[in-house]
């Protein structure tokens, strides 16, 4: 259904509920210019959320779950969060009254649980960087052969031994990431968070810090954290909508968006106890519901593909990483010496392919990590502002 039809559908259902309440209940709130303006804001919020998810859902299969696409998803969350923040601020007089004060506080408490997901995703980014370093060793093993600018010397057995050893280490590392208890890295206590003061970390070397310092405990579970975020999340009933003058709708919308974004991050990036068993069931009369459910189904279908079933992350670049390194490993294992000219050319072509993938990852991970960090800090700031608004009101009573 086109976004305009969703908009009209939601607008009619919401306004009809408001008008029916005004007619049928002598105790109903008088329809004031403030309420009329608020209704327009709520419908506008639904439309903007829908536009974001329609755009995300329009991405091709090749683009879905790429670093660029996941970054776009985070941009969408930040945009929705800012719109939601405006609604909370503009209508604080209603937000601070029961039951809205409880509902808004509940959303912000759920958002706190998303902070651990952000930190776990940051850990996953660092894990991918460790894989990059191993790929660099493989590339250097074949490129650093003293050929100089005049030409390249034939590849020797020593280079293949070094590459083979590194590729095996890479394969084991990627397998270990699926089971955090078997990973030597995860045996270290995880203690890093986006919220920590950089000055406190100044004395750690980058290499040591990245390989041994983490942000969530060994017992932490991404699957359980997602379940906690979505626990008891229910679609607002008609009576709830009228009782809150419709303000429950953006709270439900923002909570669902938060849950979906965190779920998609866990699906894409390596982290502890990844699990996609989160229930989404958004009614179609929500403008954004169709697109969000379609994206959910597409990601689930991607996870069911034969070549993706045992992956440590559905990120497109991880899939390319796994595929390319596996092919390289098979090629290295198949060579016989003396090396034929044809086989050497094939090896060099594969090394060049690894180099391009390495460069793409290098250029994509930093911007992605910055966006995850921005989401983390935006959640913290929004929660502080929101709870402060509710707290100040109750304190003045």
Swiss-Prot record:
The keyword Membrane applies. Disruption phenotype: No visible phenotype. GO terms for cellular component: cytosol; membrane. It is a single-pass membrane protein. The chain crosses the membrane at residues 247-267. InterPro entries: ROH1-like. The keyword rRNA-binding does not apply. Pfam families: ROH1-like (PF05633). Belongs to the ROH1 family. 'Roh' means corner in Czech. This is Protein ROH1D. The lineage of its organism: Eukaryota, Viridiplantae, Streptophyta, Embryophyta, Tracheophyta. The gene is ROH1D.
